[in-house]
Amino acid sequence: MSSDDEGGEEYLFKIVIIGDSAVGKSNLLSRYARNEFNAHSKATIGVEFQTQNMEIEGKEVKAQIWDTAGQERFRAVTSAYYRGAVGALVVYDISRRSTFESVGRWLDELKTHSDTTVARMLVGNKCDLESIRAVSVEEGKALAETEGLFFMETSALDSTNVKTAFEMVIRDIYTNISRKQLNSDTYKTELSMKNRVSLVKDDNKSSTQGFGFSCCSSS
């Protein structure tokens, strides 16, 4: 726990996982939060979330990660689902091109229902399915660079890059928050566990510039 002058204050960052149905959102979350994978998991009904703790610069950070169904019939939860989010993982399945083509729609929805400064990562999931790949790494990187997103390919099945992807988003949120006047009473209130964080940046240049990572890399 932190021993700084804020008395080990904890911060809560709400992160949402979005993307088409069956791209592996729930398994990404369960792999990160519980190190579990269910090959026969059914489509998420409604909304669920998991909380994961990290320590960054001596401060306890809680990431509350929300998962919801991608099917159109569940879109009624949209506003509440996005409210207060400061980070988002936009997920597609590298073996299903249609899910990649839907990324633009999900980004538009994210922009509509959340602050434009949300830390965002494009995630090409199921990179273990290399033999039936339908979206190249280069295409994923190019889209991420165009939209100003981090990019990473993951596999919830074998854990490739899952922890790295989530923690990169969490650290980016923390970095953005740290740029602000954390000693001000306003930000202490916003960032306390009693309130959901609202992320505001000083400028329009997001630090979430395109990052390219291949799940097949050795690093």
Curated annotation (Swiss-Prot):
Q: Which GO terms describe its biological process?
A: protein transport
Q: Does the keyword Acetylation apply?
A: yes
Say where the lipid (S-geranylgeranyl cysteine) is covalently attached: C215, C216
Q: Where in the cell is it found?
A: Cell membrane
Under the heading CDD domains, the entry gives: Rab11_like (cd01868)
Q: Where does GTP bind?
A: 19-26, 67-71, 125-128, 155-156
**Location of the motif Effector region:** 41-49
Which family does the record assign?
Belongs to the small GTPase superfamily. Rab family.
Q: What is known about what this protein does?
A: Intracellular vesicle trafficking and protein transport.
**UniProt name for this protein:** Ras-related protein RABA5d
Source species of the chain: Arabidopsis thaliana
